[in-house]
Amino acid sequence: MSEAEVPEKLDSADINRVLELLPHRYPMLMIDRIIEMKSDESAIGIKNVTNNEPFFQGHFPGHPVMPGVLIVEAMAQTAGALVINHLGTSGSNQLVYFMTVDRARFRKPVVPGDVLHVHVTKIQSRGSVWKYHGEGKVNGQLVAECDLGAMIAGQGTK
């Protein structure tokens, strides 16, 4: 990739930039925007949880609750976008493969109308392997947390 083709590193990302950074698309895109990115150290992503989310049809009818695994996915996507942005590449050139989830805790349900703030903080990185601590918060209250491991690789790498 030439210098002219390297996307600018930004300290936040609207939905258009998120779509450039990540290969995920509806219905699996779990981040609407990123309001803060600090190098490869930390980021805060936003997920506006609406009643129109497809997972609410079955989880649970009459009492919709965002599945915990999708809160973890939102954390992984926020961390992935942070790493891709830091490296100055795009989701079309690199993929972030989710490798591990440790110490996952779900403390409160996330429901339609909530704004999920996804905080990720780097624990360590070695080469292409990255580890982050993630926290999900609604109205400033912790709703979920975990540690995430991921590997970054070029498209087509297995």
Swiss-Prot record:
* UniProt GO BP: fatty acid biosynthetic process; lipid A biosynthetic process
Q: Which UniProt keywords apply?
A: Cytoplasm, Lipid A biosynthesis, Lipid biosynthesis, Lipid metabolism, Lyase
Swiss-Prot/TrEMBL catalytic activity: a (3R)-hydroxyacyl-[ACP] = a (2E)-enoyl-[ACP] + H2O
Tell me its EC number(s), please: 4.2.1.59
* Superkingdom to which the source organism belongs: Bacteria
Q: Which SUPFAM superfamilies match?
A: Thioesterase/thiol ester dehydrase-isomerase (SSF54637)
* UniProt-listed CDD domains: FabZ
Q: Which cysteines are joined by disulfide bonds?
A: none
Localization of this protein? Cytoplasm
Q: Is Signal set as a keyword in this record?
A: no
The function of this protein is: Involved in unsaturated fatty acids biosynthesis. Catalyzes the dehydration of short chain beta-hydroxyacyl-ACPs and long chain saturated and unsaturated beta-hydroxyacyl-ACPs.
Return the similarity comment. Answer: Belongs to the thioester dehydratase family. FabZ subfamily.
* Protein's recorded name: 3-hydroxyacyl-[acyl-carrier-protein] dehydratase FabZ
Q: What is the lineage of its organism?
A: Bacteria, Pseudomonadati, Pseudomonadota, Alphaproteobacteria, Hyphomicrobiales
